[in-house]
Amino acid sequence: MTQMPDPQNPIRIGTRGSALALAQAHETRDRLMAAHGLAADAFRIVVIKTTGDRVLDRPLKEIGGKGLFTREIEDALLAHEIDIAVHSMKDMPTIQPEGLVIDCYLPREDVRDAFVSAQFAAISELPQGAVVGSSSLRRRAQLAARRPDLKLVEFRGNVQTRLKKLEDGVAVATFLAMAGLTRLGMLHVARGAVEPDEMLPAVAQGCIGVERRADDARTASLLAAISDRDSALRVTAERAFLARLDGSCQTPIAGLAELQGDRLRLRGEILRPDGSEVIAAERVGPAADGAAMGTDLAEELRGRAPADFFDWS
């Protein structure tokens, strides 16, 4: 029988300190409380500052990519300073440190990007040469492919920071994740959602993953009760696609898996950072074969890409 956490021996939940990260940590805690009949004092939220949180004046590609938002948290997990780590799966490297595993995924939120602007209701309404802020290479490349006339500027920081930059006139529009706005109770900020056919989202966008030590059987048992099968199937396919492409924050890659009964539709695309070339394809097959489909889709895109396509610096 699994030993339940209590106030003297709580489950320590590691998280970044932004409002969104804390909302995700609290959602994880609340789901565990409901699944196991536990009180809030059987858990402790542990805030850990990552390199990505500290260095805000340089683009992500200059300071190391996805691991910037996870490394310190994973170090704390390996050092037994926390018991689980709550992550936005779109920020996670495809290779995890030895001794750690993610096999718990919460029900996935809205995967779409949100268009945010005080002046305009949609991308199509942006005037020629309008300034748009984004730190996402994927969004910048997709926007450049569709609207090469727009001026794109770097927009680092959390949701509140980016909204303040918009208010200050640094740009007339930006993009955020619908999932993040939903979790923050800020859906009113979005002028509208951008459909995947128009802007394919980041791999694993909208999905929370919970990381644990591979040898921690008690925690594995607790987390199994809150893991969502559909989210796991979709994210597994998307991350297999990303892994074969060696995807990081330095790589404009988009991917989305959608379940249709026991079938999975997986779409993927790769882009040059300036939007001058987009290569896209999709696969449909048994949901259980998602990882193989992801790898196969990535192989097709790599095969269709010119030799210099991945030489991005």
Curated annotation (Swiss-Prot):
Pfam families attached here? Answer: Porphobil_deam, Porphobil_deamC
Q: What class of enzyme is it?
A: transferase
User: Any miscellaneous information on file?
Assistant: The porphobilinogen subunits are added to the dipyrromethane group.
Q: What is its EC number?
A: 2.5.1.61
Key words of the record: Porphyrin biosynthesis, Transferase
Q: How is the cofactor bound?
A: Binds 1 dipyrromethane group covalently.
- What cofactors does the UniProt entry give for this protein? dipyrromethane
For this chain, the family text in UniProt reads: Belongs to the HMBS family.
Positions of modified residues (S-(dipyrrolylmethanemethyl)cysteine):
249
Q: What is this protein called?
A: Porphobilinogen deaminase
> Entry's InterPro entries?
HemC (IPR000860), Porphobilin_deaminase_cofac_BS (IPR022419), Porphobilin_deaminase_N (IPR022417), Porphobilinogen_deaminase_C (IPR022418), Porphobilinogen_deaminase_C_sf (IPR036803)
SUPFAM superfamilies documented for this protein: Periplasmic binding protein-like II, Porphobilinogen deaminase (hydroxymethylbilane synthase), C-terminal domain
Q: Which HAMAP family match?
A: Porphobil_deam
Specify whether Transferase is a keyword of the entry: yes
Protein task: Tetrapolymerization of the monopyrrole PBG into the hydroxymethylbilane pre-uroporphyrinogen in several discrete steps.
Q: How does it assemble?
A: Monomer.
> Which biological process, per GO, is one annotated for this protein?
protoporphyrinogen IX biosynthetic process
The coding gene here is: hemC
Pathway it acts in?
Answer: Porphyrin-containing compound metabolism; protoporphyrin-IX biosynthesis; coproporphyrinogen-III from 5-aminolevulinate: step 2/4
Q: Which GO CC terms are listed, alphabetically?
A: cytoplasm
- Catalysed conversion reaction: 4 porphobilinogen + H2O = hydroxymethylbilane + 4 NH4(+)
Task: Report the superkingdom from the record.
Answer: Bacteria
GO molecular function term, any single one: hydroxymethylbilane synthase activity
